[in-house]
Every structure is written in C-alpha cells, then in structure tokens.
Design a protein with these regions (language model features):
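Domain-level signature for soluble enzymes in the chorismate/prephenate branch of the shikimate pathway
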Residues: 1-96
C-alpha cells in the first residue's frame, strides 16, 4: 500500500474538503448570529423563543430543495443537530 499523504490528487481533494468545511462553519456561525438577533427581538416583543412548527417547516423545505447525494433522512438528522446546537449556543450566550 502506498503513502497517500504524498499523493497530490488526495491532497487536492482534501484541500477542497477543508475549504468546504470552513464554508459550512462560517455559515453555521452566521446562522447562530442571526438566531441570536431573532431571539433578542422575540424577547422584546414577548414572543416564544422557539417555534417547533417553523423548525418542522424548515426541515421539510430543505428536504424538498435537496438535490443529493445527501438523503432526505440525513438532511433531517443534520438539520436537527444544527438546530439543537444553535439553541444550545444561544442559551449559553444568554447565560453569560
């Protein structure tokens, strides 16, 4: 078996993956920033902080928009994780 770390094609794919991962991270951080602003506004207005129907709508919308190769089941799992992480982060920042 050869050393894949010296293979330029492997390195090129890895660099593309890293760039994509950074873009995903930036998008998630942007999402959290926007959700924080929304939660602050909702608090000022006396609205409920969480809207489960909106979360369900978003998941279904993203599944309809999904062109693959990620399965719709995985879209739902991934988005539930992102929503949960966002809510935990917003709660953590509120407590700070």
């Amino acid at each position: 078996m050869s050393d894949q770390s010296s293979d330029p094609i492997v390195e090129q794919f890895r660099n593309q993956i890293t760039d994509t991962d950074l873009a995903i991270l930036e998008a998630i951080n942007k999402r959290i920033t926007t959700v924080r602003k929304l939660h602050a506004y909702k608090a000022e207005q006396g609205y409920d902080a969480v809207d489960p129907s909106r979360e369900e709508w978003l998941t279904q919308y993203l599944q309809r928009c999904n062109k693959g190769p990620l399965s719709n089941d995985e879209v739902a799992i991934l988005w539930r994780s992102i929503i949960d992480s966002t809510l935990r982060e917003v709660a953590r920042l509120r407590e700070a």
